[in-house]
Amino acid sequence: IAIAIGGGYAWVTGKKVAMTDMPQMIAMYNGMGGGAAATIAAVELLKAQGEVASGAPTGDRLNALGLEALNTHPETIAQAMGTDVAILAIIGAIIGTIAFSGSIIAWAKLDGRLNSNKLLPQQQQVNLVLAVLLVIVAVSVFNTDSLMPIVVFFLLALVLGVFITVPVGGADMPVVVSMLNSYSGWAAAGIGFSLNNSMLIIAGSLVGSS
């Protein structure tokens, strides 16, 4: 049902878009892809945090572990998800969230709704500080049993996506859209690994490498 609704809406709206407005539409759909990957990552992280809070596996992990679940008491998100899965989920979340907010800004600039090329003085230095903070918070998410680091993590990633894209001029926007498209693909591939979903891995890798 979801595929039918989404595909039908995209088909109807896509037919109405003029060729001159095609870059805006591509930027918007890039953002949706990144947002979808980030949302899946958020759900998985929140499920893991719920396991930590309850002191026992739930859902799919409970079914997978069976009787072993009785002796399993995860204390961090990394323990609840597994180290490799947690790393991939966090990487996918970062890339997907940046692709989402960055694509929204790209759409706004291409559509003439945003003309600013700088939000703050020393914008590049601010971006660097934000990136460092994001890595630090990502590590804390990996080792946390609390909800707050997850919230801060996604907020920082959203802001970083905006700050990275705003300084880019209109002439370079096609390059940014292409880069964000690649980000969306790699985000989907990362989430595919964390979910053990071959289709997401293949499709995401194809989009990312393109």
Model regions and ranges:
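Cytoplasmic-side transmembrane-helix entry/capping segments in multi-pass membrane proteins
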Residues: 21-33, 118-129, 174-183
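C-terminal ends of transmembrane helices
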Residues: 7-26, 103-117, 160-173
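Generic transmembrane alpha-helix signature in multi-pass membrane proteins
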Residues: 12-16, 26-27, 35-46, 165, ...
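Transmembrane alpha-helix boundary signature
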Residues: 1, 12-21, 38-61, 75, ...
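Alpha-helical transmembrane segments in multi-pass membrane proteins
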Residues: 2-6, 10, 14, 33-36, ...
